[in-house]
Amino acid sequence: VTHVVPLVRTLQRAWPQLPLHWVIDKGGQKLLEGLDGVVFHAYDKRSGMGGMRALRKELPTESFDVLLQMQVAFRANVLSGFIPARRRIGYDRSRSKDLHGLFVNERIPDRPGIHVLDAIGSFCEPLGLKQAEVVWDLPVPDAAREWAGAQWQDDGAPVLMISPCSSHARRNWYPDRYAAVADHAAGKGWRIVLCGGRSDLERSTTDAIVAAMQHPALDLVGKDTLKQLPALLERADLVMTPDSGPMHIANAMGTKVLGLHAASNPARSGPYSDVRYCVDKYDAAARKFLGKSARELKWGSKIEFDDVMDLIGVEDAVAAFERYRSDRG
């Protein structure tokens, strides 16, 4: 959802009084609650058609001028059919799937080879706008920053924060390798902080990382809320994570990211503002698992095979960390 926020800001700069309604999942609503000028309508995909009908009753009775249909999955396409709108703007044909074209009557320009955020940003172009600058300005309450500020004393030590898990298990790196990089950073005087959600996988992964480390680490996994997470990521100097939500939240908060990419292409879905400190094994993964170079794959192809993240060695992540440390001075 963080990729959509700059588009919201672009629309608001052009039309400050524009009423905006956003159909969103409950987690996204919790994260973005307080986003000025936006009315959220939470939809739980588990609610099926009943939830879609309930959403229709919740929406204004009059038809919208424009619907920006920024999801192509079949469920999202069907859901859009419950939203009355005169102009229904969707993705270009190359990005469409699951009957997307049946639910839209306009399309964004077809530009291959661009970041997901830029593709979303182009939804303003049929409206006569351009997303000339990318601004997030996520709504972070003062209380969230106070909580984050209380988690460790600011003694001048730089902070490497590790958010070890993605929503896709095959994008996740290995606990012993996280631990090795963390120990390397700790040996250079860095504070190590672990963050994450409350799932069993995140808990077991974190426990394994801490057990494998030779240096101490601050374990905050499962202790923050979605509203506190941006404030927590903001306190880090560098966040090490696979392709994940925290990667994009950290980037939105202005924190540099050491992204771990093999299953996905950082040029398409890496930290938008700066990929200099990412490990990029996407081409190696394409050659090993698909027998093709990354250039030969359809843009956006995922390489989510077992052990694809094995292509990223400890030395790769340490080298990325040292690139950041050198630039930081």
Language-model features, listed with the residues they occupy:
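Catalytic machinery of carbohydrate-active enzymes
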Residues: 1-329
